């Protein structure tokens, strides 16, 4: 009775939607200690004593006792779940009345399942009443047999095929189709191996038994089929697939009954266990990707690290969803504790088959097509026919925040029921949808809802299978709230019936390109998981360890808690909004739910704001409580300073900018300005003018300032008219403003049609000057109304007619005060600069900023300084510096163009920027200044110059325009309405306050000024967002108004003018567009004949372009201001319109503009649009036809499609999904293709070339193997004959060198033992004390015997260098042993490098150039210190791949394991020989490549070597994905960027550089395991002028050129030098690309014997850059070493520019190639070869003698040898130089091979010999070989002559040669580091020690030991070397 009475009262007093559903009388409310209601206790009472009257119309009907007795079990189950008394239920009671939601349905279905009823949670939800539910339970179902029948048919079809394909017994496996969810994830993972993997980690206490953990996992994996699942692509079964039974899918799940668990245990020394786990995950990801998921994609890892143990599960999402994971870990915990499983669970075969039975694929496809097709954008261009490079799909990093919903679960459930929903899902769908539509500014959005399919069948609850699915949620924001919720309720139920669609189907329906995310947002509603045995688990899970990357911007997770609470978690792309904005978004979502609850169900969206908190709406409240009391006139501050500081400068004009002289200026003080302004005012007043418009069109002069102020003092309105405007525009402004007077000069009104009422005064006319001088100078009394117009400024109009904006005196005064306070705050020094500071007046008079510049200067007592605008801009740094500018306002583009930096403006304290977006570079430069306050300024003319501003910091968003100023209030309203949008949502900015101008002149039709709720405001038309702190973010324009070069214009005005100027009727559309070829924006007008049919192909009418563009642009220049003249006027076939709105289709026009090249637009080339985009038409080759057949089998037949060799796969209909199938099918035809490789080669022709390239690589093998074998045999025979005087029995084989070996060894032989010891590397390793030294030696002996190259030495034979391979039994490693104290061990090892290198170089023809050194501490056994091992090896024996193989072999040999036999290098040498047989083809290719290249660029003088590195911000995965989509390799991308940046840095538009190739991509048997230096180095060319207009085109050219060059990669560099007649190096810079091998499992890798500590590489190039791609860390690192630059900053800048270009690529930008190289800064050109010295017949004796040696060596005739002709022409190259230099020495010329290479002509070599005094005369006796002096007798102090001063020479008593150790240390100290080898040994002197005696002792010691009296010097005779000089 009480409940009924309360209910009646509530119904009478409350609106219907606020009447509670349930009334429960209690004697009291339970409370806790804080007197709050104890909700937990209350719920217990409710559960025990719940009573209720149903709210249905039959609530009062009598309950049928017989029916209740019959169905008591049903009612009791409902009572147990719903907490309701059975006696209150009737058969007509609805489940929605009872609050049965999705969770309750699951619980009910589960209870019915336990009683044997087969009913799903969906069927429970589908029941309207209890009787409906009973009817469902009464039906006997045949589901079990149905799914088993389906599975049986599936197995019958697929199992034989799979068995045959895998050659496996069908009894050992079973199959099941994949779900939609699994298919989609597997396809995406094949595209990117890092996607859709999950990693979970748990901390294992010390009490956990690892063996039992493993047993538990084994038990679980044995009993759950999902953990035995691998995947088989259906594409393997080409023909059979079309006949398959069951659902179509990309993969088949294979349940392998014999699958073993992937378990590993790792002991890691690393301190970062997360990094170790990441390495484990990365290894599994790569392995699975490479093997196409042919084994179960999961692994358990136990990581033992220091004092903790971690258990990690890495698993692919195709095997596991969140609910299954909880069940899985519950079972593992149970198995660990009890050795049993808790329950029998539904397995994957049954689960997937049950789902398959439910759905009809055709019906589902039709349903989703109907639901989603309305969302297709009518302007979507898709990518099916596009060949343009795509932006890389961005991987999004989420930031997550959460809050507890204000309303409880029960409240929200009741709300959902009132709005027509059976669960919370439709309610949150609508709430989230509304927020998204507002954020994206769209009426419709599509997002995804992730739901568990376990609801569909009661048997699926707890199933061990991934049963999640993503359902599309199309949402349209229209109608009232109840309608929207109801439509989503219907969609939920329908989607359950039809099932989830394939992601590929959704993409096709929506016409989304492969680069677009399918869903921009994802929503999940779930119940907080209960403890499923978690208490049994003895381990604790880590939360949120790894960064997760996704492809959707928003994710909303709604969690229903067991305590009647709802937690809302929002994850957002962290680049999309700030954390504060994200928090506001979440609060607004919660507030929206509250507003739903407070409002009537039929309320519209706009009505909800009434229930929204103001702080969540976009209102920036005024910071000033009241409006300014406008008591001061605009001239107030001028008059004030004139009285208080009359001598201060007020205005200054620069009149002279000549040459290097200081800028000439003239100025007025405040007193003079004020008096002159008063004279002007009186002159006007005497003309009886008041409140009239007065025009000013003057130059930048002192009188102009006075006239502007004087007009305002006189109570009239200033009308600025820019002198450069067309006459028609000037005339219009005079007429429209009804100007009574116009101040002009320099005849700038000649030809202007003047209105009769306008009186023109020429300020330079003598009569005006005299009249002005007679006027009174006293101040004018200010008795004018505040709202009187101060100035009238015209802006552009959309109808072609400019609009005059009336700005009042009060507006201008308020502006001065508001901005004065801002500037005083951000730049407080401004308050101290009165009389000193200067405000630069740079703005045009057509721009209202020029008024702000003047009046803000006078606000602070500064001087307004100006001058001729172009002269100031011509050298802006000079302007700032010499004029002493302290304050300025500049558009950002001007800062970029002039390159102005803070250092150029030493006096500047304030810089205002606005009108354009600022570039990041400019922002960083200026915002980082401690002296200058950088402020972003915003304000339409209608709101008095500027109404909002914000300080710009280095990390600021440059779109932020700060906060409203003064008493301004900013409102952000929904466009076209007076309703505020939510904070963070886009809307139109509306300004209120004293800055809002009076209005427009003569334009009652003009929109903008408005009255809202009785308050005057201005609608700016700008679309903005208001952030959480009320700062405003500028997004763009809502209309056609844009800003060009900082000035606002309306695009419609430009279009209207063009239309009026055209001689024929045309339609015009004007847009502001970006072009992919440049970062510049263009104003573009599209024109078409009026009435042109809007159908057919939209095309550019290029034949009329030049005429129309030129004629109409010239006409515009006569009519429009310069900034309004279009850059291009493009004729097109018709103006495209949108189907939905009939508005101009701007996207289609933008797309067309992007297809036109800059050359075409500027008239520099013919049309590319109407040219065929492919090569001349030809028939497909047989291979191409074969490829096309396979492609059609994947994408379907289309007879209408014209297929050509250059047709792309995407044009043929292939998408990312179908490419997976295509890759598998092509593999069966012999193509080695991956999905990524297909995307890199997207044309039929390119795929055919891949096949041909594979074939050609086979064909490149010796076509005449016998001839090559014979040639090798002849080489061996001749070499053996020449070695008769040597012991030859120990030689195993003789072989030619590889091209790079030849160069390296020749360099070594020709340079002898010079100090650098080129191409010898020393690698130092630590040996653990436990390592046995003798075992190390034995291991190396085994490795040397097993490796040919380590048994190879080199000899010079005639014109070649050959390899001598020593027999295994004679190959003994050469060891050196060192010992020293622990502190000096490494120094001792380092000091012997030079000696070892000399030994290698000297004996390279006798002993393999490899040495082994062992350094151990004295008494190492007792000290337990580590020993050091050094491997010294010549580069001719290894590359980075082979040296790693050698070290691996050593590790194996040390453990006494048998070594794998390394393949012989003979097949590689034969392959090279076969490639070199066709020399003419190689010569033709390389000479063509170098054709036109100027080789005269002088080598840059070497600087000190600089080394630096930089890791790119973009990850390796991101870059590889980018390259995959833009048809380029990562190597080509970095190489092209390197070449371009280097060319720009060196100012060389035509650049040759070297590229290192691995040499292991050729088809040679055993090449991968060959321990040999397979690398090759080839030259590449970059020509900025011809290789492409954009960076992408340039990189593509570089890639294509490299691809072609690889065919000739083994061409020897000496041959190239000979063909090109180049004596010096072909290139001075080198690029190499290395991709590291994936890291090994740290569990499988043992501790290595050799632990590297130090290594070195010799640098023989001015610049060497290595790009290292590391999959283990997912990074790309650039490492470089150079002698090219003076400063490290220059080298760092080169890498920074490279990263900048790469980063721009990741953003989808394609920058234009900058071809402006200016002057040659770093290089100068040498004269052409042969003109260094004039050729003449006057040969010196020395030159004649050298010529005779050349003739004797080459066989040339004496008259054929020229003085300056390079030696290369006579066959003297890097190899033959060795013999030539020997011949020279035999003839008395002491020169080395290196001397000849450095001086490669007769004239140069003669000069060198004369300079170094190395000529000893011609030796008549061949026995006199002019050998190097030997013996101490030849070492006299005379050798120092010329090297030291005479004074020093007199002090020297002896000269001696240095030991190798001394020479090495001195060289290193001089060349590398002056502190090297300098040691300081301090001693403590005991008390009483005599300092004099100490000094005497040292003096005697120095006198006794000459080493303490030795200095070191470099001499050049008889060869360059270091010597020691002993002093007296």
UniProtKB/Swiss-Prot annotation:
Its EC number is 6.3.2.-. The modification O-(pantetheine 4'-phosphoryl)serine is found at residues 102, 1216, 1774. It comes from the Eukaryota. Disruption phenotype: Leads to the accumulation of the intermediate N-5-trans-anhydromevalonyl-N-5-hydroxyornithine (trans-AMHO), displays sensitivity to oxidative stress and shows deficiencies in both polarized hyphal growth and sporulation. Changes its interaction with the plant Lolium perenne from mutually beneficial to antagonistic. Residues 1297-1706 are annotated as: Condensation 2. Residues 65-141, 1178-1255, 1740-1813 form the Carrier domain. Coiled coil: none annotated. Residues 640-1045 are annotated as: Adenylation. Pfam families: AMP-binding, Condensation, PP-binding. Residues 177-460 are annotated as: Condensation 1. It is an enzyme of class 6 (ligase). Induction: Expression is repressed by iron. Keywords: Ligase, Multifunctional enzyme, Phosphopantetheine, Phosphoprotein, Repeat. Pathway: Siderophore biosynthesis. One of its GO terms (cellular component) is cytoplasm. One of its GO terms (biological process) is secondary metabolite biosynthetic process. PANTHER family: FATTY ACID SYNTHASE (PTHR45527:SF1), NONRIBOSOMAL PEPTIDE SYNTHETASE (PTHR45527). Belongs to the NRP synthetase family. Nonribosomal peptide synthetase required for the biosynthetis of epichloenin A, an extracellular siderophore that plays a crucial role in endophyte-grass symbioses. SidN assembles epichloenin A by activating and incorporating three trans-anhydromevalonylhydroxyornithine (trans-AMHO), 1 glutamine and 4 glycine moieties. Trans-AMHO is produced from L-ornithine via 2 steps involving a L-ornithine N(5)-monooxygenase and an AHMO-N(5)-transacylase that have still to be identified. NRP synthetases are composed of discrete domains (adenylation (A), thiolation (T) or peptidyl carrier protein (PCP) and condensation (C) domains) which when grouped together are referred to as a single module. Each module is responsible for the recognition (via the A domain) and incorporation of a single amino acid into the growing peptide product. Thus, an NRP synthetase is generally composed of one or more modules and can terminate in a thioesterase domain (TE) that releases the newly synthesized peptide from the enzyme. This is Nonribosomal peptide synthetase sidN.
